[in-house]
């Protein structure tokens, strides 16, 4: 068996980690051991927050819809119930955009939801 020296692979691995740690403060960007910990933690945060981002945006859309619906004298939950009964299938992202950009069109949607509630 030939002797295997690992200098090239470890150098490449270190280089990859230090490249990811570029811009970090202090030794976190220059010392491999510390950089590895920082990079691993950053990747964990990134993974977690890609999922949290979906929750956060949904909550934002609901808040915007709720604020717009209350101007028309209705609550968010009754509005969503009215949309369901009226057979209007618009997702919260689009509803929030309509409420934010085109209040007249949103008012028409609210009227249809109110009519479906009875």
From Swiss-Prot:
Which purpose does this protein serve, as stated in its record? Binds directly to 23S ribosomal RNA and is necessary for the in vitro assembly process of the 50S ribosomal subunit. It is not involved in the protein synthesizing functions of that subunit.
Q: Which domain of life is it from?
A: Bacteria
Report the HAMAP family cross-referenced here: Ribosomal_bL20 (MF_00382)
Which keywords are on file for this protein? Ribonucleoprotein, Ribosomal protein, RNA-binding, rRNA-binding
The biological processes this protein is annotated with in GO are: ribosomal large subunit assembly; translation
Q: Name one GO cellular component term.
A: ribosome
PROSITE patterns per record: RIBOSOMAL_L20
Under the heading InterPro entries, the entry gives: Ribosomal_bL20, RIBOSOMAL_L20_CS, Ribosomal_protein_bL20_C
Gene Ontology molecular-function annotations: rRNA binding; structural constituent of ribosome
Q: What is this protein called?
A: Large ribosomal subunit protein bL20
Q: Which PANTHER family match?
A: 39S RIBOSOMAL PROTEIN L20
Q: Does the keyword Ribosomal protein apply?
A: yes
The family classification in the record reads:
Belongs to the bacterial ribosomal protein bL20 family.
Source gene?
rplT
